A protein has these predicted regions:
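Active-site T/S-Asp motif of two-component receiver
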Residues: 54-56
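Alpha4 helix (beta4-alpha4-beta5 surface) of REC/receiver domains from two-component response regulators
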Residues: 21-22, 66, 89-104
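A Lys-centered signature of the CheY-like receiver
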Residues: 70, 108
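Acidic catalytic/metal-coordinating carboxylates
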Residues: 37-40, 63-69
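Receiver (REC) domain active-site loop signature in two-component systems and cognate sites
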Residues: 59
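Acidic, metal-coordinating helix/loop segments flanking the phosphotransfer/catalytic sites
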Residues: 34-52
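Two-component/phosphorelay signaling modules centered on CheY-like receiver
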Residues: 14-33
Length: 108
């Protein structure tokens, strides 16, 4: 796996973004950028420089599930790996994320 891949971390809670960033850094992934919701993430994604997306589900503006659907509907972004890191632990939500095309789902 390319340790220089550019990873976008999307979460409205800055402490959670920092925790994820630190965990990634500990694994050797230091090329990260941040956004506080789906709406602010889209321009970053559209820049074409992101290799991996980590997103929360519950955020103001555009939620993580809506961001995931946006990514999967976009011809240039649809193959982007997406990991959802969220407090949403209900079976229905995990199924919804899987059906929307998430690559991984971690309950925080």
């Amino acid at each position: 796996m390319d340790k220089n891949m550019k990873i976008l971390i999307v979460d409205d809670f800055s402490t959670m973004r920092r925790i994820i960033k630190n965990l990634l850094r500990d694994l050797g992934f230091t090329n990260t950028v941040e956004a506080d919701d789906g709406t602010t993430a889209i321009p970053v994604l559209n820049s074409g420089s992101i290799d991996f997306l980590v997103t929360d589900w519950n955020m103001p503006g555009m939620t993580g599930i809506d961001l995931l659907r946006h990514v999967r509907a976009d011809e240039k972004l649809k193959h982007l790996p997406v990991l959802m890191v969220t407090a949403e632990a209900k079976r229905e939500q995990i199924i919804e994320a899987a059906q929307a095309g998430v690559n991984g789902y971690v309950v925080k």
